[in-house]
Amino acid sequence: MAAEDELQLPRLPELFETGRQLLDEVEVATEPAGSRIVQEKVFKGLDLLEKAAEMLSQLDLFSRNEDLEEIASTDLKYLLVPAFQGALTMKQVNPSKRLDHLQRAREHFINYLTQCHCYHVAEFELPKTMNNSAENHTANSSMAYPSLVAMASQRQAKIQRYKQKKELEHRLSAMKSAVESGQADDERVREYYLLHLQRWIDISLEEIESIDQEIKILRERDSSREASTSNSSRQERPPVKPFILTRNMAQAKVFGAGYPSLPTMTVSDWYEQHRKYGALPDQGIAKAAPEEFRKAAQQQEEQEEKEEEDDEQTLHRAREWDDWKDTHPRGYGNRQNMG
């Protein structure tokens, strides 16, 4: 029974070839990346490559103590497993887990590049880890402009990688049919897989550079969201209730609110008072009695006569005073103190 189970388990070559084939199908698929068909291939390929990686670890097929020449030509292709894992991880579509997918894909690419660097597959510089990149960014944050020399060197490196990648793809396409059909000798097979390793070194370096840029953008977006959320939470707090200082309360009790706050009479009292004097709107102008008219006329006549008499007397006194001043000049009669 155990022997039958072992026969049913997929072997390492089958896991590797199926995973590689699924990756090729995903890369050339015409359907949207988020479609169900494409995502099923992505998940299935990741599962197969994960099993292949576990099997490689159990078999201890590669060791850092050995050189590249000591690895069998047919086993060189299994060094590509981490690179395939990183490429398929990048194909996952889930916006809420995008940052996790990017970090996991970066780990796979770094694992692949580390193996190739240890075996001296090609001459290249390993990318910095995320912690070193963060420290480097913090140290260089005070620089207003990047170094022109560094920018030029990065551009030149990208151009060189692109040319090398195109050349490798051309050579691989020429050797593919012979190797896969089994007609190539061991030397050609070894050269074919070494070219594959070099090609995926260039791809991994480009992917890591793109991943670092996207991770930076996502983290800045998350930090801005947190800042906006904290600001909105402050704005959504209930308004502060108005408060009155004790001093103002005591002052209002003594001096009042600035206007008569207590009534001096009721509405009924006001109505009776105005009704008594006939000043209500519906009462019209109050009518005076005939006796009152007669008294008012008599008082007016007496006042006019009095004013006329007062005027005559005043005029007479003024004329007498003028005559006296004409006959008595200033200083008249003051003769006692004269020498």
From Swiss-Prot:
InterPro entries in the record: TAP42/TAP46-like_sf, TAP46-like
Keyword ATP-binding tagged: no
Coiled-coil annotated residue ranges, if any: none
Feature: compositional bias, Acidic residues: 301-312
Region (Disordered): 221-243, 289-339
Site keyed Cleavage: positions: F255, G256
Effect of Y162D: Abolishes interaction with PPP2CA
Biased composition (Basic and acidic residues): 313-329
N6-acetyllysine found at: K241
Result of altering R155E: Abolishes interaction with PPP2CA
Record-annotated UIM domain positions: 46-60
GO cellular component: cytoplasm; cytosol
GO molecular function, one term: protein phosphatase 2A binding
N-acetylalanine found at: A2
Tissue: Ubiquitously expressed with highest levels in heart, skeletal muscle and pancreas.
Places the protein is found: Cytoplasm
Pfam family, one: TAP42
Region Interaction with MID1, annotated ranges: 225-290
Positions of the UniProt region annotated as Interaction with PPP2CA: 98-202
Its job: Associated to surface IgM-receptor; may be involved in signal transduction. Involved in regulation of the catalytic activity of the phosphatases PP2A, PP4 and PP6 by protecting their partially folded catalytic subunits from degradative polyubiquitination until they associate with regulatory subunits.
Domain notes: The UIM domain is required for protective effect on PP2A.
The protein's assembly and partners: Interacts with partially folded PPP2CA, but not with the fully active protein. Interacts with PPP2CB, and with PP4 and PP6. Interacts with MID1 and MID2. Interacts with ubiquitin.
Name of the protein in question: Immunoglobulin-binding protein 1
Species name: Homo sapiens (Human)
Lineage: Eukaryota, Metazoa, Chordata, Craniata, Vertebrata
Gene that this sequence comes from: IGBP1
